Amino acid sequence: DQDGDGYGDNATGPEPDACPGVPGNSTFDRFGCEDGDGDGMSNISDAFPDDPTRTQDSDGDTLDDLEDNCTLVPGNSTIDRTGCRDTDGDGYSDPTVASSNSINWNESDGADALPLDPTQWLDQDGDGYGDNPNGSLPDACPTEYGSSNLDRYGCPDGDNDGASQGNDAFPDEPTQWEDRDGDGFGDNPNGTSPDA
């Protein structure tokens, strides 16, 4: 035991010194190497050599595996799950699997419903319009699935013309949605029964 740390230099003996020329106290990953924080993990393998409460960071994102919800994927999410990929940087993690109930998506599903939009993260009705009223393309009907995108975003639109049901002058005619003069003929000159 040339370094006097209590671990023998014979590589085939019991508890052989992995660092025979340097006195050390590591016992977890290898015997007899330096362990600055005294947690048992050698400084060679310890991702946090100065912190005895943390030892391993499998994905290299500076979070210990014990606090990292995605130990094999580097990430910077902090709000719903810690240490998972967060493409848009809003703090909510990107989805890793599809929600079990995509119609009623919520934060407990563990991921950002809109991972490419930093202003939106929650989409309760799963229609693609975020529930944050101050974010981009906010859902005016956050609990009702909808495809409207002309007068307001994310509200029911039975004829899929872009105008929400409550504001569509022709709710069953997809080529007309507005009638400014109220004469029963649509304002879209290319639609069915246009106003002359």
Which residues are covered by each model-predicted region?
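Extracellular calcium-associated, cysteine-rich motifs in secreted modular proteins
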Residues: 1-196
